[in-house]
Structure formats: C-alpha cells, structure tokens
Amino acid sequence: GFKDLLKGAAKALVKTVLF
C-alpha cells in the first residue's frame, strides 16, 4: 500500500541522513 511505500522511503531517508 501507499503507507508501506512511505515507510520504505522514510527508512531510506533516515539511513541516508544518519549514515
């Protein structure tokens, strides 16, 4: 669903920012 896609994008963004 859209929520899952948003979750994935948020995770990737956090990973990029932190690491």
Curated annotation (Swiss-Prot):
Question: What tissues has this protein been observed in?
Answer: Expressed by the skin glands.
Residues modified as Phenylalanine amide are F19
Question: What keywords were assigned to this record?
Answer: Amidation, Amphibian defense peptide, Antibiotic, Antimicrobial, Cytolysis, Hemolysis, Secreted
Principal place of residence = secreted
Q: Where, per UniProt, does this protein localize? A: Secreted
Which terms in the GO cellular component ontology are assigned?
extracellular region
Output one GO BP term: defense response to Gram-negative bacterium
Job description of the protein: Antimicrobial peptide that shows similar potency against Gram-negative bacteria and Gram-positive bacteria. Has a high hemolytic activity.
Please give the family membership noted in the entry. Belongs to the ascaphin family.
| Protein name, entry field | Ascaphin-8
Q: Which organism is it from?
A: Ascaphus truei
Give the taxonomic lineage as stored in the record: Eukaryota, Metazoa, Chordata, Craniata, Vertebrata
